[in-house]
């Protein structure tokens, strides 16, 4: 009986130690920066292309330690404490051409970010044309443009870099780096933290 009692006491002590360690670890770990992207697909993209694009953009943000949650249409999505919400509008050709004309957008621009209202505008017809011309998968290019434009929403003005995902022109070379710089990562994480 005494032997069993000691085993039970020891098991309880080990369990308490493990639970305390787990609670301390959870409390000491900072909450992961999260962006909730509310997507309106006015271009009616193929679901596989949009899913692939979201996966590409998610990988780019994940490499910076940032979690992405994608919400489509009128769905409000999950409530996530500390998350920053942005709007992504994948424009139809007609909508994009109106915006391009109204804003005087250059012919090589694939999207625009309006930081004031937290919206990224994606010119899907231009991305599709570039994908065909460069023989690249549209989902990959769309994902890069999504990450780039959302990056503009979170970074200071004039945030283009010489290379990486925030380069002014999309780099189609297979060896290109498709990531945020360390400075950009820090700035994005700070923007998410200060928005809350």
Regions found by a protein language model. Give the residues of each.
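Acidic/histidine-rich, surface-exposed loop or edge segments in extracytoplasmic proteins
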Residues: 30-45, 125-131
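Solvent-exposed coil/turn segments that connect beta secondary-structure elements
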Residues: 40-42, 89-95, 125-127, 158, ...
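Bacterial N-terminal signal peptides
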Residues: 9-21
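Post-HExxH zinc-binding segment in Zn-dependent metallohydrolases
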Residues: 159, 165-196
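Catalytic Zn2+-binding segment of zinc metalloproteases
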Residues: 149-165
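N-terminal secretory signal peptides that target proteins for export/translocation
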Residues: 1-5
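Metzincin-family zinc-dependent endopeptidase catalytic domain
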Residues: 47-153
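Boundary at the C-terminal end of the N-terminal hydrophobic targeting segment
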Residues: 21-28
